[in-house]
Design a protein with these regions (language model features):
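Conserved Rossmann-fold NAD(P)-dependent oxidoreductase catalytic core, especially the SDR/UDP-sugar
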Residues: 1, 67-119, 130, 137-139
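N-terminal Rossmann NAD(P)H-binding glycine-rich loop of SDR-like oxidoreductase domains
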Residues: 1-11
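Short glycine-/acidic-enriched loop or helix-start segments at secondary-structure transitions
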Residues: 5-6, 29, 64-66, 112-114, ...
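Oxidoreductase cofactor-interface core, primarily capturing Rossmann-like NAD(P)-dependent enzymes
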Residues: 13, 111-194
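Short beta-strand element of Class I
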Residues: 17
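N-terminal Rossmann-fold cofactor-binding loop
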Residues: 20-24
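NAD(P)H-binding glycine-rich loop region in Rossmannoid oxidoreductase-like domains
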Residues: 32-88, 92-95
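Single conserved hydrophobic/aromatic residue that forms the stacking wall/gate
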Residues: 192-202
Length: 202
């Protein structure tokens, strides 16, 4: 969902991109190539000439799951996708020469949180920081608006429109953001990173 939005923005900019996916991507930009992979075999993945990695994998959850109500199996599945897969991909990208990484995490992420979702996000952030990329962008958005395929998210979108204006000060970080807007922010950072790298190498 969010990854597709970022691909759209990057496509407009014409930035060469390699998109990793489980299945073929609809409306893939002409500047992008896709690589269909088995996420259970990331150790066998071979990629080259990567400059910047964007990570936005996330196990599909419902609101009550994010709030902490998860079965043991769901916790294991979440950890596998949100932590293990993403960390393995980050390490592969680093080996392939990636200088920068952009990670979509979550507001309130904390490796010491009692909330499994937020703890998992925080643990991944800590591990990514240890990989020593030259440029690390970690985004911690609140609720992401715009996923029209999920009725529960559409409901949350509507609630956000009324609640967001009342979130001031320390609460402002919990405001929702449209996936399209976040994608534009992420892509702008990628452009800035690319331009900075070109200047260093010129």
């Amino acid at each position: 969902f969010l990854g597709n939005e970022i691909l759209k923005v990057i496509g407009v900019q014409g930035i060469p991109t390699l998109a990793l996916s489980r299945r073929p991507i609809v409306n893939l930009p002409s500047c992008a190539d896709e690589l269909i992979i088995d996420f259970n075999a990331i150790s066998e993945l071979e990629i080259q000439n990567i400059n910047h990695l964007y990570l936005s994998l996330g196990y599909p959850l419902y609101f009550h799951n994010v709030m902490g109500f998860m079965s043991k199996v769901l916790k294991e599945d979440l950890f596998l996708v949100d932590f293990t897969y993403q960390l393995e991909i980050a390490k592969k990208a680093k080996e392939a020469g990636a200088q920068g990484i952009s990670l979509i995490s979550a507001v309130g992420s904390n490796s010491h949180s009692r909330n499994h979702y937020l703890k998992t996000k925080g643990m991944l952030e800590s591990e990514i920081m240890e990989l020593d990329f030259e440029s690390i962008n970690i985004y911690q958005p609140g609720h992401l608006r715009g996923n029209k395929s999920r009725p529960d998210i559409l409901f949350a979108d509507a609630i956000s429109i009324f609640v967001d204006p009342f979130m001031f000060g320390s609460l402002s970080k919990f405001r929702s953001i449209s996936a399209k807007k976040l994608a534009e922010v992420v892509a702008s950072c990628l452009l800035y990173t690319s331009d900075a790298a070109d200047e260093r190498n010129s």
